[in-house]
Regions:
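Ferredoxin-reductase
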Residues: 1-42, 134-135, 142-143
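A generic local secondary-structure boundary/capping motif
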Residues: 11-14, 26, 46, 98-99, ...
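Gly/Ser/Thr-enriched, mixed-charge loops and adjacent short helices
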Residues: 33-136, 142, 146-152, 163
Length: 202
């Protein structure tokens, strides 16, 4: 049964990730596929992009010498179902859990939205949710791209530095990430928050 998620962009994030709707095109013209992704067929996908985003997508596609080599999505979903949410959580937990030492005991965490995806990820990772005595507080802003925490910016950067540098889903080098404006990469604030809990200094 479909359900609403805490933020519209988070909902689109899950929908687009599971719809394989993203393509990264390097400045050299090389197309890199992420999350098992395929280029979005704009005429069939449910979320609308602005004229500016459509123009950027068109320019990037035109820069690729063999456009026929870019597979197109067969279609999308109109809603976010429980199965898609579960698949997002499964995949993200699998990737993030490999970042941490198995002996590391996560610090109790407080989160602003106890029903959100971040809470689901933390629970699956064995992180105790403790609103009263938490050593770390996390909040994902409504646009789904910004993580706020009780740690300083420098501590966050230090904790996530290697994880961000080695994550296969983060494009490297100059290029253009072609996407629906609602698409959030798998290095979004939700997965970043979960990774921070496992990697932050105790």
């Amino acid at each position: 049964m479909p359900r609403a998620l805490p933020a519209p962009l988070t909902a689109f994030s899950v929908r687009m990730v599971m719809a394989d709707g993203a393509l990264y095109i390097r400045s050299s013209g090389e197309a890199l596929i992420y999350l098992g992704g395929r280029a979005v067929d704009r005429s069939r996908e449910g979320a609308l992009a602005s004229e500016a985003e459509l123009s950027l997508i068109d320019e990037a596609a035109a820069a690729v010498s063999d456009e026929a080599a870019l597979p197109r999505a067969e279609g999308g979903w109109e809603c976010v179902g429980e199965g898609m949410i579960g698949a997002y959580v499964d995949r993200t937990v699998s990737r993030i859990s490999s970042l941490s030492d198995a002996a590391h005991v996560p610090t109790p965490v407080s989160v602003e939205d106890p029903t959100g995806l971040l809470t689901s990820l933390l629970e699956r990772l064995g992180v105790p949710i403790d609103e009263a005595g938490a050593g770390l507080s996390l909040h994902v802003c409504c646009e789904g791209r910004t993580l706020c925490s009780s740690l300083s910016e420098e501590q966050v950067r230090t904790a996530l530095g290697e994880a961000l540098a080695t994550s296969p889903v983060i494009p490297a080098g100059r290029g253009l990430y072609c996407m629906d404006p609602a698409f959030v990469m798998d290095a979004d604030a939700i997965s970043a928050g979960a990774a921070l809990v496992l990697l932050a200094p105790r």
